[in-house]
């Protein structure tokens, strides 16, 4: 049915204006003032912003890790995302050495099909570069529309790839038009530090942070940037948590390299002291990279403001405190890494960023949606409000105040790392391809409505000035 959103203030990455939006066949059909209401369902957005739907470039739903599986699957995870103002996610498809990439991708399709309530795509993890993998990658891009590959520089003996694998992936990505993503921590040194800590009898959650110091994130980030320069390729550094990594990304961008940086809300508002909470509650805040000392927060905020970091992902990777995080009692290395973040990503950036004057409203939209769409081959179908774009829209009340709590969130976990935090602004209604998923803060979507999205190659949808040194 045709829908007409009236009386809202439309906000994109570049503009703010008052207009009506006419939606037909899942697309934005007309943008204008005082549009004809006949035959349309009218939605009144008085007092609200209308944003492009958020895009979360970093989720781990229904993912095995550390002897267990993340609690949120593609149903609960995408429902929570929708309540938070996200209409598209890109999840990480894990691969196994020696196994065809196609098999891993089929596994991830099976996890999502019939469950997702919003649209989704996949990144592909690269754990080894063999002749078979190199032969399969062009098919992955052409047939599956997967145009981003992730390499882990940490998690020794689990996910970690060596530098040769990273370099060869960068070279292949340049030739194929893909974007390489890295988890940048020095896994070899972390492996040594964690073993030494345990030998010395240090088992508490705080040692997760103390054995993964920011210097090791900075070192790995710099190494990845140098390999990117050598390969003449493109790099996206995920979940940047510290000043040392920001510095290396800024250096690379100032040299004109195609290097991009993502941070996450947890690094903007939480700090290392949370890992010292008594009664093992610090385990709730164990993820990698770890939370840093508080002073890093303003460095990250300034990097978002100045364009040294460009996007905000959630790194959604949720485990229950009881029964899952508790697997690490007596050994911090056994605590499943990750947290439930997907639902609060947009609200935290708006409340702590826009409301507190750290970033502008246009920057906010760019950081949670538009830039991600451009980098990952979704723009202009997604990530903007324009005629012909998917009607992925968030009607957002900027005045509502609420307190984040596990009692009211929609994630399938027994805690929220932002428990008790007051935020201003929240989504009222959320549409994905013109259909309500959330309406008046009530879930009205359907599992299975979400569609798999094939993505364009890196750079195909970006203007030249977007690719290099875009601030």
Swiss-Prot record:
EC number: 3.5.2.-
Binding-site positions, Zn(2+) 1: 58, 60, 150, 315
Cofactor-binding details, from the entry: Binds 2 Zn(2+) ions per subunit. Can also use Ni(2+), Co(2+) or Mn(2+).
Modified residues (N6-carboxylysine): 150
Gene Ontology cellular-component annotations: cytosol
Temperature dependence: The optimal activity is at pH 8.8 for manganese-containing form and pH 8.5 for cobalt-containing form. The oligomer is thermostable and retains full initial activity at 40-60 degrees Celsius.
Keywords: Hydrolase, Metal-binding, Zinc
Post-translational modification: Carboxylation allows a single lysine to coordinate two zinc ions.
Known partners and oligomeric status: Homotetramer.
Name listed for the protein in its UniProt record: D-hydantoinase
């Amino acid at each position: 049915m045709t829908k007409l959103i009236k009386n809202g203030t439309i906000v994109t990455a570049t503009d703010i204006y008052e207009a009506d939006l006419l939606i037909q066949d899942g697309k934005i059909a007309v943008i204008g003032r005082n549009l004809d209401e006949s035959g349309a369902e009218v939605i009144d957005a008085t007092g609200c912003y209308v944003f492009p739907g958020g895009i979360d470039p970093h989720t781990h739903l229904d993912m095995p890790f550390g002897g267990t599986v993340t609690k949120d699957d593609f149903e609960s995870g995408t429902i929570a995302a929708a309540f938070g103002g996200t209409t598209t996610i890109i999840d990480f498809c894990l691969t196994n050495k020696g196994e065809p990439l196609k098999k891993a991708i089929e596994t991830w399709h099976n996890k999502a099909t019939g469950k997702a309530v919003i649209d989704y795509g996949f990144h592909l993890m690269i754990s080894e570069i063999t002749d078979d993998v190199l032969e399969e990658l062009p098919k992955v891009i052409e047939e599956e529309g997967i145009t981003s590959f992730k390499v882990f520089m940490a998690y020794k003996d689990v996910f970690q790839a060596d530098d040769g694998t990273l370099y060869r992936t960068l070279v292949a990505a340049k030739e194929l038009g893909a974007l390489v993503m890295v988890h940048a921590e020095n896994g070899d040194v972390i492996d040594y530090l964690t073993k030494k800590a345990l030998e010395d009898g240090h088992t508490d959650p705080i040692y997760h942070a103390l054995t993964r110091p920011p210097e090791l994130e900075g070192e790995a980030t710099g190494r990845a940037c140098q390999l990117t320069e050598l390969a003449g390729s493109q790099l996206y550094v995920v979940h940047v948590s510290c000043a040392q990594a920001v510095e290396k990304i800024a250096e690379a961008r100032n040299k004109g390299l195609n290097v991009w940086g993502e941070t996450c809300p947890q690094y903007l508002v939480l700090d290392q002291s949370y890992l010292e909470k008594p009664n093992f509650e610090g385990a709730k805040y164990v993820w990698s990279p770890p939370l840093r000392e508080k002073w890093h927060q303003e460095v990250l905020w300034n990097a978002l403001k100045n364009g040294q970091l460009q996007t905000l992902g959630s790194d959604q990777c949720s485990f229950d405190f009881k029964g899952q995080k508790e697997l690490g009692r007596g050994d911090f290395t056994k605590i499943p890494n990750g947290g439930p973040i997907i639902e609060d990503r947009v609200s935290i950036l708006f409340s702590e960023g826009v409301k507190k004057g750290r970033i502008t409203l246009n920057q906010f939209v760019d950081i949670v949606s538009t830039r991600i769409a451009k980098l990952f081959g979704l723009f202009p179908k997604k990530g903007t409000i324009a005629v012909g774009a998917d009607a992925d829209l968030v009607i957002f009340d900027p005045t509502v105040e609420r307190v984040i709590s596990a009692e009211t969130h929609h994630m399938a976990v027994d805690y929220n790392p932002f428990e008790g935090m007051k935020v201003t602004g929240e989504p009222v209604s959320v549409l994905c391809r013109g259909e309500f998923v959330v309406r008046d803060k009530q879930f009205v979507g359907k599992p299975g409505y979400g569609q798999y999205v094939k993505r364009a190659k890196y750079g195909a949808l970006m203007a030249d000035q977007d690719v290099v040194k875009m601030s």
